[in-house]
């Protein structure tokens, strides 16, 4: 689901709210999460999950096209860990 599809679905569920207000809320939430991660903070939404940073150590990689070794520097990557309630909701037994 894209961001615009999310906003459309929220608008359909909340017809009394203007679409622009929903758009501003979605963008605001995503910006808050991004800004918090940029500052090194962890964001937890109880029952849904938490967003944090994982730090990757420098390592020796390989260029898949040429096979040459490439030094990759250390970096931080965003990480999402699903909460118990979200895990339970999506764990549908066949």
Swiss-Prot record:
InterPro entries assigned to the protein according to its UniProt record, in alphabetical order: Hist_DNA-bd, Histone-like_DNA-bd_CS, IHF-like_DNA-bd_dom_sf, IHF_beta
One annotated GO biological process: regulation of DNA-templated transcription
Pfam families: Bac_DNA_binding
MF terms in GO: DNA binding; structural constituent of chromatin
Record carries keyword Transcription: yes
Subunit structure: Heterodimer of an alpha and a beta chain.
Protein purpose: This protein is one of the two subunits of integration host factor, a specific DNA-binding protein that functions in genetic recombination as well as in transcriptional and translational control.
Protein name: Integration host factor subunit beta
């Amino acid at each position: 689901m894209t961001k615009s599809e999310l906003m459309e679905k929220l608008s359909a569920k909340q017809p009394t709210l203007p679409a622009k207000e929903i758009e501003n809320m979605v963008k605001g939430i995503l910006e808050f999460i991004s800004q918090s991660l940029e500052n090194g903070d962890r964001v937890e939404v109880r029952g849904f999950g938490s967003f944090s940073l994982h730090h990757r150590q420098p390592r020796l990689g390989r260029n898949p096209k040429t096979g040459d070794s490439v030094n990759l520097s250390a970096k931080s990557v965003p990480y999402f860990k699903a909460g118990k309630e979200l895990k339970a909701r999506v764990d549908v037994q066949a």
